[in-house]
A protein has these predicted regions:
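Conserved beta-loop-beta element that borders a ligand/cofactor-binding pocket
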Residues: 1-7, 16
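Hydrophobic alpha-helical segments typical of transmembrane helices
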Residues: 10-13, 115, 140
Length: 166
């Protein structure tokens, strides 16, 4: 599933977008994700290299399932926008058009048609062993995200200063 952490390009992007836009047009708004903390993934890699998970498939997922819309709202709320900005779920054909346009923007695509297609399948745990099989209790996004997205965090303060400069 999606990996989140202090320098991620996922929740931080959604938090920044909400500082600039009055609403968020969102393709794939109802897609499901089970975000996992980068530190839990790193620990799983270490434990696997030490032999605990060697030659096994481990599903690296956090304990909570969200829709993309809920993740966008959580990012906004955690960054100091109560409830986050309104999210406008886009119909599939508009989402495809949005992704096509984003593929051609400078700086790497925020979303591609391939990303959108992959979101049609839920990015959540199945019956395979998870992080707990390595003795790892996955951290909840709802507990970790506010520690790095909050309005008093360095990255957020820089964004606030840039917004005031405009």
């Amino acid at each position: 599933s999606v990996i989140f952490g202090a320098d991620d390009k996922f929740l931080n992007l959604f938090a920044r977008m909400q500082k600039l836009a009055p609403f968020i047009p969102l393709a794939g708004a109802h897609s499901q994700f089970q975000p996992v903390w980068v530190e839990d993934v790193a620990l799983a890699v270490v434990k696997s290299l030490e032999g605990q998970g060697f030659r096994r498939v481990i599903e690296a997922c956090g304990p909570e399932v969200y829709t993309l819309k809920q993740l966008v709202q959580l990012a906004g709320n955690a960054s100091g926008i109560p409830g986050g900005r309104p999210v406008l779920p886009l119909p599939d054909w508009v989402g495809q058009l949005q992704a096509l346009v984003m593929e051609h923007l400078p700086g790497g695509p925020l979303m591609s048609r391939d990303n959108l297609a992959s979101m049609r399948v839920a990015n959540v745990a199945t019956s395979l062993p998870g992080l707990s099989s390595l003795g790892i209790q996955p951290a909840a996004l709802s507990a970790i995200a506010p520690t790095y997205l909050g309005p008093d965090k360095p990255m957020q303060r820089n964004d606030d200063l840039r917004a005031r400069k405009r």
